[in-house]
């Protein structure tokens, strides 16, 4: 079959007429120096602060220092293959993370990429990791309780939805355990939890994930992890990624709890980045804006007004102290930003008081207005009782001939300390907390030997579940204390069946 010359010329003409050349314009620069996870790039004159840039090997970077002749970029990934002279491309995007319900039950890194081996996260929604905190008129005062399930916290240092409560203490004093128990207690509370692990060991994070999975809490939890082996920029970004994921739910009218474990490691990572970027160091070699680092993060926790949907985001930041020194730089910064702190003391922890909450140095500045009425009534005198017990305890060591009132205070104090102890991963429903604290503050435990208190508590709960379920349900539903005679009758009825061990 022969093709005629005219046909060929017609085909060529058609091809030429249909040819379209699309011009792709990229703003590119050149790496002039690279090392320690930082690249200096020349030629990105129009780059925005916090913009994502892409290196020629596909690794992303974050523009941090915008200087006269170059841009300081922190590299968000392996930097060994990046060389001087490599091309760097602007993306035109500010750093953002994927958000949405699809993330629930997943373990992701601060870039929103899954690290749990369960396939990709199928969400198309994203949010910028840096966004302004809700304004004054968009907020509402904290008035709903966030039940942690931990007696010593719910009674003495209550937390409300939308509050920021610092958990501070030395290493190995049970900070993470408090967070895990709080997350476990949010089951059936219509609460979404986000656990941000910053600079933790991979094995520790795995342990936390398995604990949450075992108790069925992973279904409403997102775990964001930047482990100790990750580059410093990822440790710095992790909390912002976590709060961005939480804000998506908050602005949709839901309630969110975000745990930052812990912000000391984020501050250390930020110090490392700042020094490598040649920013001037300040106190303890931290950069001048280390306060702003944490304040802009924690200000994003809020209880939104009804006009904005009434959602809330509660923050539980952790700070690790050295030898109990809460007056160091980062601890004082975060104490001044948050609405109260829970101080965990290693002396108490090692003497068997767990959770090791020090009620004298712990405070909740707004949670009191969120406490349910029943708890307010039974826990009103607890803090004073404990304080006077600690004071008298010191004197009691020197003298044996104590008057009856002092002896009674010491007895009540010892029983209070015992009641506030709690086992790991066993959060208590608020109605049961009210029941045991009622028994304590109304004197029903004064004649129960201290070593029997724990058994008394367990058996009391079993007795109430079987015989007085209506009392517990009434506290849970109304938030009010049932009539005194009903409570007294129930506890006296149980005491008649309780046999002390000696």
Swiss-Prot record:
Keywords: ATP synthesis, ATP-binding, Cell membrane, CF(1), Hydrogen ion transport, Ion transport, Membrane, Nucleotide-binding, Translocase, Transport. Its EC number is 7.1.2.2. The record marks 362 as: Required for activity. InterPro entries: ATP_synth_asu-like_sf (IPR023366), ATP_synth_asu_C (IPR000793), ATP_synth_asu_C_sf (IPR038376), ATP_synth_F1_a_nt-bd_dom (IPR033732), ATP_synth_F1_asu (IPR005294), ATPase_a/bsu_AS (IPR020003), ATPase_F1/V1/A1_a/bsu_N (IPR004100), ATPase_F1/V1/A1_a/bsu_N_sf (IPR036121). It comes from the Bacteria. It is a peripheral membrane protein. Its main location: membrane. It is found in: Cell membrane. ATP binds at residues 169-176. Residues 117-139 are annotated as: Disordered. GO terms for molecular function: ADP binding; ATP binding; proton-transporting ATP synthase activity, rotational mechanism. SUPFAM superfamilies: C-terminal domain of alpha and beta subunits of F1 ATP synthase, N-terminal domain of alpha and beta subunits of F1 ATP synthase, P-loop containing nucleoside triphosphate hydrolases. Gene3D superfamilies: 2.40.30.20, ATP synthase alpha/beta chain, C-terminal domain, P-loop containing nucleotide triphosphate hydrolases. One of its GO terms (cellular component) is proton-transporting ATP synthase complex. It catalyses: ATP + H2O + 4 H(+)(in) = ADP + phosphate + 5 H(+)(out). F-type ATPases have 2 components, CF(1) - the catalytic core - and CF(0) - the membrane proton channel. CF(1) has five subunits: alpha(3), beta(3), gamma(1), delta(1), epsilon(1). CF(0) has three main subunits: a(1), b(2) and c(9-12). The alpha and beta chains form an alternating ring which encloses part of the gamma chain. CF(1) is attached to CF(0) by a central stalk formed by the gamma and epsilon chains, while a peripheral stalk is formed by the delta and b chains. PANTHER family: ATP SYNTHASE SUBUNIT ALPHA, MITOCHONDRIAL. Belongs to the ATPase alpha/beta chains family. HAMAP family: ATP_synth_alpha_bact. Produces ATP from ADP in the presence of a proton gradient across the membrane. The alpha chain is a regulatory subunit. This is ATP synthase subunit alpha. The gene is atpA.
